[in-house]
Amino acid sequence: MHCKFLDHGVAISYDQVVKPCCVWKYDSSWATQNQLGSINLDTWHQSDQVIKIKNQLAQDSWPSSCEHCYNIEKTGRGDSIRLNGAQSYAEYSGDDITLEIRPGAVCNFACQTCWPEASTRVAQFQHQAGIIDIKDVNSQSISNFDFLLPFVNRIRNVVLLGGEPFYDKNCLKFLDWAAEHLSANITMFTNGSMIRWDWIKNYQHPITVVFSIDAVGTPAEYIRYGTEWDTVYQNFQEIQKYNHVELRVNITTSAYNYIYVQDVVDLLLVKWPSVVSFGVPGDAYLGTQVVPDQCRADIVTSLNRSIEKIKSTPIELGQQQNAVNALQSIVDALETNNYDHVLHQKFKKFVQDMDRVKKINIQDYCKFVANMLAQ
């Protein structure tokens, strides 16, 4: 096995630890040795620790840090970060770099499946609910990007994360810095609530905008708390008018939205984006095991319906297979994994805690999930 990110990836995490990709799992030893301010980014891919990981993969042995991709690929899915990188960066030369950078974590949403380091609002609400102590959230911002200048000509692609890139002030600073210094393709993940249209129009190089959409309409306004669906949908439609912008969509599948994924699929089937990816939260209490047996048939039926629609629509074959495999893996899990009452109660308490501090009620937005929690 080989991973392009071990040759070309530079991902700067919340705590300014450098790693090959966004899903790289690291321990305290890696964090100590790979702090942004103490390594040479220009030669980092030739370091002993990175070469050791390359050699292990070459022996078809999965490093523990690659757990995320292993869990996806073992199910037969072809949309892991590693496999996506093999396709996306196939033409990279030895010096080309993909930079993933998170200048800040300020966000105007508090999505139910998000985590404190990625959203200041999530951190605030979870702190209010007593789930975390906000003082323990290690999410550092970056406001000066000139440290990238020594190898700026090697940066071929940038993945910009937040917070919300069009809301966080340091992300906006990076966009302005990029317009002045970079000739790279820029990919950014957005909640779709606000787009800086002047930057979209004026950036002289290719742009990829990844909309995070987990549901449509009223359920979206609960699951991705902060959403005004009409605004997100309008921006989703508007971005497709720009020829230099590639549209992608990421769907995070969880117990919150298994039943609502069909609505997102129906929306996308009108004009399937270049890439549709499916994310999975890391917490077991957001997964299939929390779904009571009596609620599973309805979800399976809706997902199977979506699978058949995808199969019968003329979509690029690889994308079609990835979408089918992602949904089929949920169906298989619902049909084989036993219900876990302890996890169900943990999910129920999490929902209650979030509803309390956000002053909302899931019953008003997601009746199926509310009824599922009442079982």
Spell out what each predicted region is:
Residues 8-11, 46-59, 96-102:
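Short, intrinsically disordered, charge-biased short linear motifs at domain edges
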Residues 25-68:
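Membrane-interface junctions of multi-pass transporters
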Residues 146-152, 175-180, 200-202, 239:
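Leucine-rich repeat
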Residues 5, 19-23, 62-74, 106-117:
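Local cysteine-cluster metal-coordination motifs and their immediate loop/turn environment
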Residues 15, 187, 205-210, 228-374:
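Conserved C-terminal portion of the radical SAM core fold
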Residues 96-106, 117-142, 153-169, 179-196, ...:
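Core AdoMet radical
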Residues 76-89, 119, 123-127:
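Short cysteine/histidine-rich zinc-coordinating motifs and their immediately flanking basic loops
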Residues 1-4, 93:
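Short loop/turn motifs at secondary-structure junctions and domain boundaries
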